């Protein structure tokens, strides 16, 4: 999954022969144990102008200065909603650093 690779890069994991994980090993989309450290890092890198919020059956990233990013998730899975919000946050964060 390309989104798992995106998350791994955000977490500074390298998909090289030197890494203990291969891309196919990334479990961000299926495991809270993998995903929660990402949520914690997002909380650390967020500034006073960014709000990262996840609600059951809905997740969104709010950039107070510029715009809102809403991710509508039609699922009863909190893991999936969180995963999609994390991916959108990272994509938005990457655009800001360009």
Give names to the regions the model predicted.
Residues 1-98:
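Glycine-rich anion-binding surface patch
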């Amino acid at each position: 999954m390309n989104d798992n690779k995106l998350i791994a890069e955000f977490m500074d994991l390298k998909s090289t022969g030197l890494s203990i994980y291969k891309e196919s090993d990334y479990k961000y989309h299926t495991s809270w144990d993998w995903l929660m450290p990402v949520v914690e890092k997002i909380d650390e890198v967020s500034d006073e102008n960014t709000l990262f919020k996840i609600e059951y059956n809905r997740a969104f990233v709010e950039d107070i200065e510029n715009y809102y990013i809403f991710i509508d998730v039609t699922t009863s899975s909190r893991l999936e909603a969180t995963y999609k919000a994390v991916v959108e946050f990272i994509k938005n964060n990457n655009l800001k650093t360009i």
